[in-house]
Swiss-Prot record:
Biological process according to GO: B cell activation; immune response; interleukin-4-mediated signaling pathway; negative regulation of inflammatory response; positive regulation of DNA-templated transcription; positive regulation of macroautophagy; regulation of immune response
Molecular functions (GO terms): cytokine activity; growth factor activity; interleukin-4 receptor binding
Record's protein name: Interleukin-4
Task performed by this protein: Participates in at least several B-cell activation processes as well as of other cell types. It is a costimulator of DNA-synthesis. It induces the expression of class II MHC molecules on resting B-cells. It enhances both secretion and cell surface expression of IgE and IgG1. It also regulates the expression of the low affinity Fc receptor for IgE (CD23) on both lymphocytes and monocytes. Positively regulates IL31RA expression in macrophages. Stimulates autophagy in dendritic cells by interfering with mTORC1 signaling and through the induction of RUFY4.
Family to which the UniProt record says this protein belongs: Belongs to the IL-4/IL-13 family.
Gene3D superfamilies: 1.20.1250.10
Signal peptide interval: 1-24
Amino acid sequence: MGLTSQLIPMLVCLLACTSNFVHGHKCDVTLQEIIKTLNILTAKKNLCMELPVEDVFATTKNTTEKETFCRAGTVLRHIYRHHKCFNQPLSGLHRNLSSMANMTCSVNEAKKSTLKDFLERLKMIMKEKYSKC
């Protein structure tokens, strides 16, 4: 009985520490995958990179990080569904951003940018987030 009472706090601590490690590691892996995909895409020279997309990064006032990720994912989904450009990597980016945002949203931006500029900006945001992870 005495051994059990000594083990309980140790097991609770072990579970808490393991949980923090696993969640931190998931953040790192997801961000690494996003950054790697963005590096590959932004290096490509393709007409698709000149497509106009909604500039969801222009309005950062009163926008949470999760909302930004959600809106960026929505833009990517629109591109790979309607323009058939970079379907596999863009759908992977959309999936990862959606898992980070964990919400649904719509995009109605008047301001536009090119897909290339959009991806470059997203890459910069993800690298900044990774440096804090």
